[in-house]
Amino acid sequence: LIVPRVLGLGSTLHLGAVAVKLGMLNPDDVDDEILADAADHLGAAQLAAAVPIVLAAVATAGFGLRRHEAEQATGKSQTANLIVAVAMNAASAGLLVASTDRQTPAAQRVTMPSLAASLATITAGISAQYATRPKGQALVIAASALMLPVNLLFSYVPVRAALKRSQSSKKRR
């Protein structure tokens, strides 16, 4: 379940292993053909991933408008935090747009809406926290708790749909 990070130090959660442990997938379900089919049918996942990205953009705009109040509440400049929030929004949107590039490998394309939505979820939580209660942590904690289900859902649904299409086409033969 825990694997070393590709970049950087530490470990990360292997979502494929989580899906298997939860009984959502079997270890041998996913192959290159299934991933290619999932990548060809990402429209719904891409559209759904746009929702947290828009929410993150709205929360970041709210943070930008209330930055001076946050600075007064914390006694610290919030410029760097705002720049990071804007960069995270841009990265989320960039990942979502990149998921439409058919030159990108299918396995990578399938994970991009999931990663975009997860990044946007945490960005929305952090930005909303700074905009409303800069010294609090409740929204950041809630957004952090949402990241795993969002990531799992956006990764799982396209693959599961591709598996169902594959199974139904095999039955018709």
Q: Predicted segments — roles?
A:
Residues 1-173:
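Short amphipathic, positively biased membrane-proximal segments
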